[in-house]
Amino acid sequence: MRTNKVIHVIGVHAEGEVGDVIVGGVSPPPGDTLWEQSRFIASDETLRNFVLNEPRGGVFRHVNLLVPPKDPRAQMGFIIMEPADTPPMSGSNSICVSTAILDSGIISMQEPLTHMVLEAPGGVIEVTAECANGKAERINVLNVASFVTRLAAALEVEGLGTLTVDTAYGGDSFVIVDAIGLGFSLKPDEARELAELGMKITAAANEQLGFVHPCNADWNHISFCQMTTPITRENGILTGKSAVAIRPGKIDRSPTGTGCSARLAVMHARGEIGIGETYIGRSIIDSEFKCHIDSLTEIGGLSAIRPVISGRAWITGVSQLMLDPTDPWPSGYQLSDTWPAI
């Protein structure tokens, strides 16, 4: 076999959402901080294009690059590459990364609990992995500070009129809207329409409401539209379903850890949930994250929470991505039949 490069990948999904992990073949990018390293990857695009574009990837795929941490508290760093963004944090991807590094032995597993500190571009997270029989069975992530920026804001969306929305940050930035009011019940056969409408709402929210992280002015847009059903109690436990539209136009298969964190911040701001109370976030395929508020904090003068996201991930395979020197598409390609135009 002829190849100009070999990238070693562990395939993983967390509650349905693909979050593959690069474990070899890629040098750490330049930058004094993980955020700077992630900005290099975002602007350079070489690695993103190679692993995310067809024929090696697709719009369904997220890929994480393991890097040495910059924060001395952390044992490992990771940079998240989503189809269109290189975000500060991702709940499902942090669960994929934690599972991959424990199940593969990159970090030694301790049963029944393994405690780790990982560094994402958006900050340090604490992980407690529930382990048995050589498998990380459940990953509990103490997420970064999550906060509300707007409650019950008016948003004009062409074809929909005036919507009432919330905006919040849970490791990434969200506009949150009632799905029932839009005529959806959040079923798999609604995914295409949800994705298209979500992109439309996100664009309107960026134009009219905007977002700037109080401690990181580089993150200055709303990334996702989270369409939600009302909170109910199932067997006494607060439960809610959501579908998160991810750029350039797909629906998260998992319950979206950063989305659950943002929703917890909104719920707490409204007095709907207390510290330590369990909330189950459910996805469009009915997978679940178990979440709760660990503590209250403050960030950039804003009241915030530290949420915990709990979910499962599974190894799907091990692969090597290669580039034949005669391949006419070294950066891959995107077609609008599966990769919607932003």
From Swiss-Prot:
Its EC number is 4.2.1.77. Keywords: Lyase, Plasmid. It catalyses: trans-3-hydroxy-L-proline = 1-pyrroline-2-carboxylate + H2O. GO terms for molecular function: 4-hydroxyproline epimerase activity; trans-L-3-hydroxyproline dehydratase activity. InterPro entries: Pro_racemase_fam. It comes from the Bacteria. The keyword Lyase applies. Substrate binds at G91, S92, D252, G257, T258. The active site is at S90 (proton acceptor). Belongs to the proline racemase family. Catalyzes the dehydration of trans-3-hydroxy-L-proline (t3LHyp) to Delta(1)-pyrroline-2-carboxylate (Pyr2C). Is likely involved in a degradation pathway that converts t3LHyp to L-proline. Displays neither proline racemase activity nor 4-hydroxyproline 2-epimerase activity. NCBIfam families: T3LHypDht. This is Trans-3-hydroxy-L-proline dehydratase.
